[in-house]
Amino acid sequence: MLRISVIARAEDTTITLEGRVVGPWVDELRHCWQQLRVAGRPVRVDLDGVAFIDARGRELLGEMHADRAVLVTGDVMMRAVVDEIAGRVPRPDR
């Protein structure tokens, strides 16, 4: 399950995610993000409450990052995932 909370302010919009970014929840997050893009405000994605991100979730977050969304987290493990998505560290061979 994934909880998606949106806080829109004059300067930006924050999407706060809690749970697992997997399966059908990836589609729900994509739908939410596409609606927010229309407003044209910068988007921040708060990943502090995320426990797991599957391959499709990582792909979507990569698309969001490429579209200038800022991925933020204070969690050490999630920071490694964000760095990988943002291309700051190479992805390990699997």
PLM regions and their residue ranges:
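STAS-like cytosolic regulatory interaction modules
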Residues: 1-94
